[in-house]
UniProtKB/Swiss-Prot annotation:
The gene is lnt. SUPFAM superfamilies: Carbon-nitrogen hydrolase (SSF56317). This is Apolipoprotein N-acyltransferase. Belongs to the CN hydrolase family. Apolipoprotein N-acyltransferase subfamily. One of its GO terms (cellular component) is plasma membrane. It comes from Chlamydia trachomatis serovar D (strain ATCC VR-885 / DSM 19411 / UW-3/Cx). The chain crosses the membrane at residues 24-44, 54-74, 85-105, 116-136, 160-180, 190-210, 509-529. HAMAP family: Lnt. Keywords: Acyltransferase, Cell inner membrane, Cell membrane, Membrane, Transferase, Transmembrane, Transmembrane helix. One of its GO terms (molecular function) is N-carbamoylputrescine amidase activity.
Length: 542
């Protein structure tokens, strides 16, 4: 019994630590045997416990592992204690899926349904696709294959098959490791070693080839502004004070610069509201543009155009956009791109955050929210955007804009490659969960798009991580971010980002190949079990 428990505990420790921002070693080891140790322990426990109890053990194991992975959600300073309920529901949902899948793997081995094991990696991709595409706005964080991205070679494997391919390989390798423990066949061992090495060999060969041909002959000169204010600090300041702080940061920018990027919802009031007076802001305006004449009242657009004129560049800034539709006021989370000539291009966030930006469940969901969680009942309706966010930064350079956690969804960002974006730009605010792991977790998930699509990215975040990353996933520049050991900091990251890009399989085909495999796997598994049901049940192991 001690040996069985030690297997389960060891697997728990490995998988808990298997996060690219926590441990690279644990991430690599977990990809090849972390889950197989759990299944080996459950396999032996079936002889002593009922299937119901085995499922409960798998559920508790997964719930606690996911609890560690999503521990950043428990920073309730700004979001309130109601987040514990959301956290618990999310963990229970994920634990139900993986506990059921784990019992299916063990059951197939107990029944000697070895042929079914071939279909199970694809079945898992189908299960994970449900939460990736179907749960509210989608849960893109912490997919099974994420630990594979802890190394440059593992991330580069994503340029072929994306998140689904990474999850498929991790599950396949662990099933083979489980089979090696049970069958001790040389074929199983050889297949396991092949699956373990395959993503690193393929990704590594591609990575080294691209690194050899990498060129920085064409660059984009960017200035990324990190204001360093949390939601609490933002609420305690006037809009004019916020602008004075932003202009003060911009004073450190050296020309020439092609684009200045500010974070998500950097200032209140939207683009066109006349919320500022000349009397209150005249000293700052004169320091920005000494010879420009201003009216008595002016807008956020006037501020942005002044910065664009001062630095002779494009300015991208996140802010809210209000629109009256049929007498009902709607709110968009928007990015405004203003060229140095004054041309305005807007992008509205398409993937909204459940609870924070909309209440799931329509009128019923809103009614329940008002009853049980009145602090989360939104006084207005937020709408998702309908169009992609490719904008012109210069005459020759295009950027694909995303806001907040949109950048973690490959299917949402992939069209930017087809629309000939040269660089990805993300505006975000991770300050809602202060002193947590979220800034790094979000950053590591978002930068996967670089190698999936073969283009660089820049991201501006209020409290970090603000960074520039090239198309091979290498960090070109980064500012300090808020964590338990590092306080909130302000700054401007000014760097030249190489625009070297390359074609990828994922950019061309997306998730379609693996989703097709997933559908075929589900059909194949059902057909296999149906056929076996008609046969005499075989004897179990031992």
């Amino acid at each position: 019994m001690f040996k069985l428990v030690s297997y389960i505990i060891l697997s728990w420790v490995l998988v808990c630590l298997a996060q690219p921002d926590v441990s690279v070693v644990a991430s690599v080891v977990s990809c090849i045997c972390g889950y197989s140790l759990l299944w080996a322990g459950l396999f032996a426990l079936v002889e002593q416990l009922s299937w119901k109890k085995v499922w409960c053990i798998a559920f508790i194991w997964t719930w606690t592992v996911e609890g560690a992975h999503f521990s950043w959600m428990l920073e309730d300073l700004y979001v309130g204690t109601s987040i514990y309920f959301v956290w618990g529901i999310l963990l229970s949902y994920l634990a139900t899926l993986f506990a059921s899948f784990s019992c299916l793997v063990v059951w197939c081995c107990r029944k000697q349904y070895r042929g079914a094991l071939v279909w199970l990696p694809g079945v898992w991709v189908a299960i994970e696709a449900i939460r990736y595409y179907g749960l509210l706005s989608g849960v893109s964080f912490d997919f099974i294959g994420w630990p594979l991205t802890a190394t440059a070679y593992g991330r580069q494997f994503g340029s072929f098959f994306g998140w689904a391919g990474q999850s498929f390989l991790v599950i396949a390798a662990n099933i083979c490791c489980f089979a090696v423990c049970l069958l001790k066949h040389s074929f199983s061992k050889g297949l396991w070693l092949t699956l373990c090495a395959f993503p690193y060999l393929l990704g590594g060969a591609h990575y080294e080839y691209l690194k050899k041909h990498f060129s920085d002959s064409e660059v984009l000169r960017v200035a990324i502004v990190q204001p360093g204010y949390s939601p609490h600090m933002h609420a305690g300041r006037t809009a004019s004070a916020i602008w004075r702080g932003l202009v003060s940061l911009c004073q450190t920018i050296q020309t020439p610069v092609d684009v200045i990027v500010f974070p998500e919802v950097s200032v209140p009031f939207g683009l066109h509201r006349q919320a500022y007076t000349l009397h209150e802001n005249q000293p700052v305006l004169e320091s920005l543009l000494p010879n420009k004449s201003w009216g008595e009242f002016f807008t956020n657009l006037d501020w942005i155009q002044a910065i664009a004129e001062r630095y002779q560049c494009t300015v991208i800034m996140g802010m809210e956009r209000w629109e009256n539709k049929g007498g009902i006021l709607h709110l968009y989370n928007a990015a405004e791109c203003v060229s140095r000539e004054g041309e305005i291009t807007s992008y509205d966030k398409r993937i909204l955050v459940p609870g924070g930006e909309y209440i799931p469940g329509g009128k019923i969901g809103f009614s329940l929210c008002q009853t049980f969680f009145p602090e989360f009942a939104l006084p207005f309706q937020r709408l998702p955007g309908e169009f992609s966010g490719v904008v012109n930064i210069t005459e020759r350079i295009k950027a694909g804009i995303s806001i907040c956690y949109e950048e973690t969804f490959g299917y949402a960002i992939r069209p930017y490659k087809r629309q000939q974006a040269d660089i990805l730009v993300n505006l975000t605010n991770d300050g809602w969960y202060p002193r947590s792991r979220l800034p790094l977790v979000h950053f590591y998930h978002g930068m996967l798009r670089n190698q999936e699509l073969g283009i660089p990215c820049i991201r501006a975040c209020r409290t970090g991580v603000s960074a520039a990353v090239d198309s091979l996933g290498r960090i070109v520049g980064i500012l300090p971010w808020e964590s338990r050991t590092c306080p909130v900091s302000t700054g401007v990251l000014q760097v030249s980002v190489p625009l070297y890009s390359y074609h990828t399989v994922y950019a061309r085909l997306g998730d379609a190949p693996l989703l097709l495999i997933a559908v075929c796997s589900v059909i194949g598994a059902i057909a296999y079990f149906y056929r076996k049901k008609k046969e005499t049940p075989p004897q179990t192991f031992f």
